Design a protein with these regions (language model features):
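Cysteine-centered motifs
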Residues: 5-8, 12
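Low-complexity, intrinsically disordered or signal/transmembrane-proximal segments
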Residues: 4, 16, 20-21
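Long, charged N-terminal accessory/stalk domains
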Residues: 33-433, 437, 448, 468, ...
Length: 878
């Protein structure tokens, strides 16, 4: 794993150091290709340039840069209020257009969908905003007028419908109830009066009010009427057969028709107020049956006419929305582009003549020709004759970090950036993570069967990625899985690979090449007899017996015979634990080696001598030696001398205690005591080497710089000032390149020097590294623990669940194995694939973030945020 990564890093460093040679400064596609290849392992080299644009061409030039998406603008008006900037009125106009577009979209709802084309429309010229405002304002006005008319018509339709039901129910009431008793109104009424037979003469003297009320308000309405009128009323109500639609909220309403009989003006006023309080609608209703029939006929005619008018109005409204839907998506893109351009122009300065826009931009060096081409295209579109000007400026700002990615590498880069965006031009862990992350995941997850299921899921997402991208799902969990589809692909492939290494597929082993162990020789040599086999539940194959072990290990992976061995767990524990230690220490050493390339690139010779070398000495002397002992023991001892094999753990503990008097634990090799003593002393020397020397060297350099500055200030002269100014102007381009390439790694030298802070910082770094080597090595044992847990869970599901189906016979066995397989598959996906897979993913993430990246990766930079229409539109759509 690590040799290939080491070679790639060495090649990257060689390419980047060779680019500094004058012979490689030639223009052409060869340099561009080499720069892009080198940028895989480091962030892109960035330039900060001052951009001068004519006011007339500024809009078009910024639009072209937005289409390109490779330029980050600095805000030169950070101290200016947003409402006091130059183009604030244009931004407000764009926001007003966005409001209209949102209104149109809300009116369309889910019935009418905007027409979406495959390609984004071009950025409109500034004058097109006026035309767009005219079109949208006209469309908004017509739609609002249509909505108001439709609402008024529906309100009128609702009232007529209520009146129609009221007249019908009232007519039914008067036809069925014609008489009221003489003593209908009495002071001792105890409740709401119920209908009884009464003379028609008394009924004629009564007044009545008819109306409509919502069904849920009827009970409190009835109770209040009884209490307020002291029971001196007669209330009759009936439910409407069909629900009505509220013209404002579009909600369905259920209403009841009521009729209230009363006697006297005072009661009438009370009833009217109660009806108003409960928002009951009261309609005039004639006492004459003939008049009621005439009114009902007129209402029916008006309802028919209203239906026709409502249909025509709704058709007109739908026509307006369909007309808008054809261009709504394109209008939205255009407005967002215009708004983004004016936001960028607000971050620029305007010179005193009001004729020039001044901007400061970051961009990758390799794309400078594309940027110049885009600026020229913007100038031509605007009709300007003055070309944009790019000038170099000096800065102490840290350049942004830009790592170019594609759909395959984006997921791995996201894992790295989640920990922290790298410092400018430091080694990017993402290319190495492409291999190491799926590999460490697979060490914990290794199973051919589970890996194959995961591989199928990844291939399904990749084969349908175009359709999934077009759907633009808003499900966050799905988007996480889909965004990491290539990561899942590699994790599944590596899981299948490690599954073959472990010889594990759903807790079962493959016997592809035939086992290297034989049982028959145990009988042939007289070690086993029928009585021994019958009387012993556990038998052991002795590799010393001739013919039992062939002497040649299984060609690939673990011998399948271990799958049925009782001591399988003991063997796998030892194997996976030692493998985890070897992988972990190799991974950490590789991280320390990568720090060397950072020191070389940034020309930090002091860090190479006082940081990298003692770090390597410490980790190699102690933990590299542990790896050596593991491998040496594997190679040195076999079945013939296994009884003499010492314990590595005891040797490693005795190494730190300088204790070599343990006669029960034999040495691994000759002169082991001398070698281990030397390594421990060498590792102890590395600690003060890291801790003490560098702070004093930094103080000496600072003192030397202060003395040089003091002497230069004493001998300062006007002539000297002029010479320095001329030299600086002649070499401004070179100075800028040096500042750009160095990034922020020298920025701390410009602050106030504090020797105590430097000592504390160095002490923290030394303690963290030394203790971290111990804790990080132990942390890699999670590879062993999770691999063991995954294998045991898989075996439990097979043994206690699915294998029970093979013990059934007949039709019961057929049905049972089908049911058990369904449960087995569901639990395998839920527990072993999702839960265990997520657990292994998080542990692999921890091993990369903490144990690996902290050896060389600072992760305290700022991300490159280019001005890109594509990014702005996609973010808005989310």
């Amino acid at each position: 794993m690590s040799p290939q990564c080491f070679i790639c890093s060495l090649l990257c460093w060689k390419l980047q150091t060779s680019l500094q040679h004058p012979e490689t400064r030639k223009r052409g596609w060869i340099k561009e290709r080499i720069l892009k290849m080198a940028s895989m392992f480091r962030s892109e080299e960035m330039y900060l340039r001052q951009l001068f644009l004519q006011v007339e061409s500024a809009y078009c030039c910024v639009a072209e840069l937005g289409e390109l998406g490779l330029v980050q603008f600095r805000d030169l008006n950070a101290n200016v209020n947003n409402f006091q900037r130059r183009f604030v009125n244009e931004v407000r106009r764009c926001e007003s257009l966005e409001r209209v577009l949102r209104f149109l979209e809300s009116e369309m709802g889910e019935e009418i969908l905007p027409v979406i084309s495959g390609k984004y429309p071009e950025t409109p010229p500034p004058r097109e905003m006026i035309d767009l405002e005219t079109v949208l304002e006209k469309l908004e006005g017509e739609l609002e007028e249509a909505n108001q008319n439709l609402q008024a018509l529906k309100q009128n339709f609702l009232e007529l419908t209520e009146l129609k039901h009221l007249l019908k129910k009232t007519q039914d009431f008067f036809e069925t109830e014609t008489n009221l008793p003489d003593d209908f109104f009495s002071e001792d009424t105890s409740g709401l009066l119920e209908l009884r037979s009464t003379p028609a003469a008394v009924a004629a003297k009564l007044g009545f009010i008819a109306g409509v009320i919502k069904r849920e308000r009827l009970v409190p309405f009835e109770r209040l009427l009884w209490r307020a009128c002291r029971g001196n009323i007669y209330l009759k109500f009936s439910e409407m057969d069909t629900p009505l639609e509220d013209p404002i909220t579009k909600e369905e309403m259920k209403k009841n028709v009521f009729i209230i009989f009363y006697q006297g003006e005072q009661l009438r006023q009370k009833i009217k107020k109660i009806c108003d309080g409960f928002r009951a609608t009261v309609y005039p209703c004639s006492e004459s049956a003939g008049e009621r029939r005439e009114v009902a006929a007129g209402v029916n005619t008006r309802i028919e006419d209203l239906n026709t008018v409502i249909t025509q109005t709704e058709s007109h409204r739908q026509g307006l929305l369909k007309e808008a839907s054809a261009n709504l998506w394109a209008w939205g893109i255009k407005v967002r582009k215009m708004k983004a351009i004016y936001h960028i122009l607000n971050s620029c300065n305007i010179d005193v003549t009001q004729q020039c826009v001044i901007a400061e931009i970051w961009f990758p060096v390799v794309d400078i020709l594309r940027i110049k081409r885009a600026l020229n295209q913007g100038m031509e579109r605007s009709g300007s004759t003055i070309s944009p000007i790019l000038t170099a400026i000096q800065t102490k700002l840290d350049p942004p970090t830009f790592n170019r990615t594609n759909k395959f590498t984006a997921g791995f880069q996201a894992i790295v950036d989640a920990y922290g965006v790298g410092n400018y031009r430091e080694i990017n862990p993402a290319p190495f993570t492409i291999i190491t992350f799926p590999f460490l995941f697979a060490v914990m997850f290794g199973d051919c069967g589970h890996g194959a299921v995961m591989l199928g899921f990844a291939l399904w997402m990749i084969s349908n990625e175009k359709s999934f991208l077009a759907q633009k799902s808003k499900n966050e969990i799905w988007n996480i899985f889909f965004g990491g589809r290539y990561l899942i692909l590699l994790m599944s492939i590596f899981s299948i690979y490690t599954g073959f290494i472990y010889n594990d597929c759903f807790s079962k082993s493959f016997n592809i090449f035939g086992s290297s162990w034989r049982v028959r020789p145990m009988y042939n040599n007289g070690v086993w007899t029928d009585e021994i086999v019958h009387d012993n539940g556990f038998l052991q194959l002795n590799p010393k017996t001739r013919g039992v072990y062939s002497g040649n290990p299984y060609p690939f992976g673990i011998d399948p015979i271990w799958n049925i061995a009782i001591n399988k767990l003991t063997f796998l524990n030892s194997y996976k634990m030692k493998m985890s230690v070897i992988i972990g220490i190799t991974h950490m050493v590789f991280g320390v080696v990568l720090s060397l390339f950072n020191h070389i690139y940034f020309k930090q010779t002091t860090n190479i001598v006082l940081q990298f070398i003692p770090e390597m000495i410490f980790i190699i002397s102690l933990f590299g030696y542990l790896v050596f002992m593991i491998i040496f023991k594997w190679c040195r001892f076999n079945v013939n001398n296994v009884q003499n094999a010492p314990s590595i753990l005891i040797h490693f503990i005795n190494m730190f205690m300088f204790s070599y008097d343990d006669s029960t634990n034999r040495p691994l090799y000759e002169h082991q005591q001398e070698v281990q003593t030397f390594l421990v002393i060498f590792a102890l020397i590395a600690i003060p080497w890291m801790l003490l020397i560098q702070p004093f060297i930094i103080r000496a350099k600072h003192q030397k710089a202060q003395d040089k500055l003091a002497s230069s200030s004493l001998s300062e002269s006007p002539t000297g000032d002029i010479e320095v100014e001329i030299m600086d102007s002649n070499h401004s381009e070179k100075t800028n390149q040096e500042v750009d390439s160095s990034g922020g790694h020298g920025g701390h030298d410009h602050g106030e020097f504090n020797f105590g802070d430097i000592c504390v910082h160095q002490a923290i770094h030394t303690i963290e590294y030394c203790l971290g080597c111990i804790s990080n090595t132990a942390s890699y044992l999670r590879l062993w623990a999770l691999s063991l847990a995954h294998a045991q869970l898989s075996e439990v599901l097979w043994t206690l669940l699915f294998s029970q189906g093979f013990k059934m016979t007949g039709w019961i066995g057929l049905i049972g194995i089908f049911v058990l397989f369904t449960v087995f598959a569901a639990l395998t996906i839920a527990i072993l694939l999702i839960m265990e897979g997520l657990s292994a993913f998080l542990h692999a993430l921890r091993l990369h973030w903490v144990e690996f990246q902290n050896k060389f990766y600072s992760g305290s930079g700022c991300s490159f945020a280019p001005f890109s229409f594509k990014t702005i539109i996609e973010r808005n759509e989310e």
